[in-house]
Amino acid sequence: MTDWIMNAGMYAVTPEVEAGWRDLVERVARDAGVTLTYVPDLWTQSLDEICHRSDLGAVHLCGYTIAVKHAAVIAIAAPIPRAIWAAGHAVYRSDLIVRKDAPYRTLEDTFGARAGWTATHSQSGFNAFRHHLLAFRTPQRQALYGEVIANLRSARNILDSVREGHIDIGPVDAYWHMLITRHAPQLTADIRILASTEVTAMPPFVAAAGAPTEMVTRLRSAFTAAATQPWFKSLGDLLLIEGFAQPAADAFARLLEWDREAKMAGFELPA
């Protein structure tokens, strides 16, 4: 019998927030009548290892990873960020951040400086950034930045790299940015948002492709009904979410469109 696991490490910006996510998913699982085991150190494994685990029960995963078929998983439900730009939908975007004392007033002002991105499997840290930059390229200006630091791996590393002056601009998941600004404001006090990308489907909780249909259905129903439960309000306030929504069947198609557009333009990597 499979011991199904859960994890929300993508958005565990502080120990308090991770505890909140754990509490929420445990309550959802209880409401669903499903037994899930929380694995706190899941993201110490490589993405490839996580994606190919057959015991994923409710684990947060980037939609771009799903879209490019790197992970054979079933999308269960995605959080609805408590943000004006989300407008009550399970969507997110990337904030392009710089230091508050940087001279830049527009994105174009950063061209020629040093940028960074996280990983080629990331929507918020790579694909969205690349798509946003695509509109600024011209035949005469194929590369926008003087230097690009690749594979910084995480939003936290982008944030720290901007704070410490290792890069001048970089993309961070806007929902992650909201959370860390609320719960660790000292880390973003010297940072400002210069621009933001278009919104796309929010990273969902997923189950392994071989997970029982009944289990997935129960979890999906419990996630989407969570906001109506008496226990939800305090956790929603902590995690800055309004509830959960089931992703549409084509929720991540737009991510692939952005990927194709960039590659057809010869823009394989943000530059």
Regions found by a protein language model. Give the residues of each.
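A ligand-binding cleft/hinge motif common to bilobed small-molecule-binding domains
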Residues: 60-72, 134-135, 163-164, 168-188
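Short helix-initiation/N-cap motifs at beta->coil->alpha
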Residues: 36-50, 81-82, 140-160
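Acidic, polar ligand-binding/catalytic clefts
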Residues: 49-109
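Bilobed "Venus flytrap"/periplasmic-binding protein-like clamshell domains
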Residues: 5-28, 88-158, 233-242, 250-252
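Periplasmic-binding protein-like
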Residues: 2-5, 9-10, 78-93, 185-221, ...
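Generic non-transmembrane alpha-helical segments
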Residues: 27-32, 109, 218, 222-231
